Amino acid sequence: MEPSGLRTPCSLLALVLLSALVLTPTLAIEVYTDREVYGTAGSRVTLSCSFWSSEWISDDISVTWHYQPDHSREMYSIVHFAKGLSSIDAGIFKDRIEWVGSPKWKDASIVVHNLELTDNGTFTCDVKNPPDVVGKSSYVHLQVQEKGPARAGLILGIIIAVALALVIVVTILILLIRYCWLRRKARVQRELSALERGKLHKAKDSSKRSSRQTPILYAMLDQTRGKSSEKKAKGGIGDSRKDRK
């Protein structure tokens, strides 16, 4: 038999190792969804869900979606995925939910078709990937609004049309103003050019007239001088005749 003193340290060592293995912290699986998603009645909406796990994606991975209507405390299971197969639970979403996730790509999304106003509520995505099963679920709130895309589109189209019409009108006015201004400017320039040409023409005519009138004036002066000299000559002859008498 072994002494009891030797068995005690071995037992303590084994206990410590076992405790270390059991108490070693493991990373919890993390699940991500949007916090709020909006949809319109009659359309469809995708509720995205992704996750991160410290373990390899195993064949035992499972995904469960729950739904809790607004103003209600009851929660319903609506989608379940396990062993590579998805199943839609009976309920208000029986024929309107589609599994579109791919766990190997860490995707656990679903699509809700033909939305109704009564679908407002909270959808919870829960993922388990053994042995990584510790973690919190993630939730997304769905808000379904009344169908109004046609009216909204009509209003938006009217606004865009009015804006374009205003832009076109303003552009035409600017072009007209610019055209009138350029035309007026060209007319003023033509008038100024005509005035300048008229002034030059008048100056030339006046210079020609002055040049023509100068010889005439000289001729008239010469004639006047000739006549005065003739008168003086005649006057002198008459005086001489008087003296002779």
Swiss-Prot record:
Paired cysteines (S-S): C49-C125
InterPro entries according to UniProt: Ig-like_dom (IPR007110), Ig-like_dom_sf (IPR036179), Ig-like_fold (IPR013783), Ig_sub (IPR003599), Ig_V-set (IPR013106), Myelin_P0-rel (IPR000920), Myelin_P0_Ig-like (IPR047014), MYP0_C (IPR019566)
Start and end residues of each stretch annotated as Disordered: 199-245
GO cellular component entries: plasma membrane
Purpose of the protein: Creation of an extracellular membrane face which guides the wrapping process and ultimately compacts adjacent lamellae.
Main localization (coarse): membrane
BP terms from Gene Ontology: cell-cell adhesion via plasma-membrane adhesion molecules; myelination
Keyword annotations: Cell membrane, Disulfide bond, Glycoprotein, Immunoglobulin domain, Membrane, Signal, Transmembrane, Transmembrane helix
Family statement: Belongs to the myelin P0 protein family.
Entry keyword annotation includes DNA-binding: no
Cytoplasmic side of membrane: 175-245
CDD domains for this protein: IgV_P0
UniProt biased composition (Basic and acidic residues): 199-208, 224-245
Known glycosylation sites: N120
Highest taxon, organism lineage: Eukaryota
Membrane-topology annotation of the record: Single-pass type I membrane protein
Compartments where found: Cell membrane
Cleaved signal peptide residues: 1-28
Protein name: Myelin protein P0
Pfam families given in the database record: Myelin-PO_C (PF10570), V-set (PF07686)
Keyword Cell membrane attributed: yes
Species the sequence originates in: Xenopus laevis
Bilayer-spanning residue ranges: 154-174
Topology feature Extracellular, residues: 29-153
